[in-house]
């Protein structure tokens, strides 16, 4: 087979022509030419030449392979229609045999505004010219059969061309280097894996991946070769908000993710990388792609495979285009569940669809799930970059223009419940984001303690595409809000919770790991100066995937009359390692009698990797770490300092290279006490 890419095109629109190279959209090409249009109409054509010589004409088969078109389009060669694109199917192979002639042949991909939004019409990937004598691989279908600790991988190939004169060989390589071979007779065959290495979601095990290579041999040369990465796992619907992965009931914990939808595949992949990496760092094990959201790129699924993040896709229908897309992605172990939303789906249809998509679970819902979210302001760095200084107040035109419906009202109410009245917009941004993190934490807590019976441990949403006051955990510039840092704790494999009713504190734990935990529950009552009033330690055992009550204690008499001065610190220790640590105030933060801290700070490191060590002489609640003019991602933030023992936090600079001396100069610290 001979393969040639077509990357360079001319956009023909409005009587003008503009040079462009894949990836592109109508909007991106016009913007590069200095033309800004809010609404585009009519027909836009992307044209290129296909040169054919005598050697090419000697080939028996000539196909165009088109990928990366997410809107309806029509493909022409020399003004002859050779195929239509529906924008749903990931790959199209159009037969151009008998149409192409010696010399230059005009290729035209046409988008009509009556079928799509021209702003986003374009190509994310190059068009390929495929010339071959016998056959090439069109599609690879795989089914996993798990039985008695082994896996049978059934492989089925669809061909373009004459498959009778080719033979196929499959090679499977495990992450440990073990190799399996199989011949595929007439494109069909199986590989028996006696000692499989399973793919596990994040927090439950290793994300083992296999590499499958399929070579198609003709009479003389290799006609085609396809490489696929896959994971071995089972997936089934569990109770409540759970999925059963490899026989283990797993609570879905994460956020709704709305892909950027940028037609520039490079930009889209960069944003997908940032989003999935951020989710993994914050202990997410799932992302929900909501109904109507742009389709993620292939890179997104690759990243979720590597990081162990389960993907749930919502669909209102499973038409041929959607099924083709799901087939194309069925090798990804991360794509575990399809939520089919609609009242008209019949059980027989579900059974039929499950047979078509054997590596995914299918759940039918009457209505689209709703996930809790509470709005907060973007990072103040983001606000300062776009909002004029004289407009930096909550009720200014610039700030109100960023707000989603009801956002400011909801923020005011949530801040009023917990915090002192903020003195300025920066303080309000800090308080509103903390309030959002705490409210979401309550929803996650209920889900975890009920083992998913109260619903998934999922909030709305991970990311913003545009500047807005929203419920997102990461703003449009990629800056983490408190809810993203709190997610490190919300979604940790083991979390500890404390609730007090009438002076009685109940400690409960949630475990989302496959091993039991034997350790100690330690708690203490302390004052604002971190002096211990009372302390106790009890031995505890937490079973795998359980949410037990660990201990109850009546502290009403100890804190009576001094609720504004005392707080509760509690933790679980496994050996010498602190698995989970939290604090609880007995009154809202606005009523607690904080003392002014004296903080000692040391920053060490170089280039982009640093650590900050902080110590305080008094209790500090939700200490925010940030730098003026420098972006960083911390392994932990919004810290509670409960003793004079130093706390060390590693962090990574996301911009250029820095020095510890400069970072010390631009360090910004604030806590809840600074709101008063």
Residue ranges and their predicted role:
Residues 1-298, 303-307, 320-327, 336-337, ...:
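Secreted/periplasmic carbohydrate-active enzymes, especially glycoside hydrolases
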Residues 11-13, 69, 368-517:
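Substrate-binding clefts and catalytic carboxylate motifs of secreted carbohydrate-active enzymes
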Residues 108, 287-288, 310-312, 361-365, ...:
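Structural detector of well-ordered beta-strand residues that form the stable sheet scaffold
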Residues 138-140, 288, 322-400:
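Active-site region of glycoside hydrolase catalytic domains
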Residues 236, 343-344, 462-466:
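Short, internal active-site loops enriched in acidic
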Residues 254-259, 291, 313-315, 340-342, ...:
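A cross-domain feature marking catalytic cores of carbohydrate-active enzymes
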Residues 263, 313, 467:
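Short acidic/His/Gly/Ser-rich catalytic and metal-binding motifs that mark active-site loops
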Residues 308-318:
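Beta-strand-loop-alpha-helix segment that lines the small-molecule cofactor/substrate pocket
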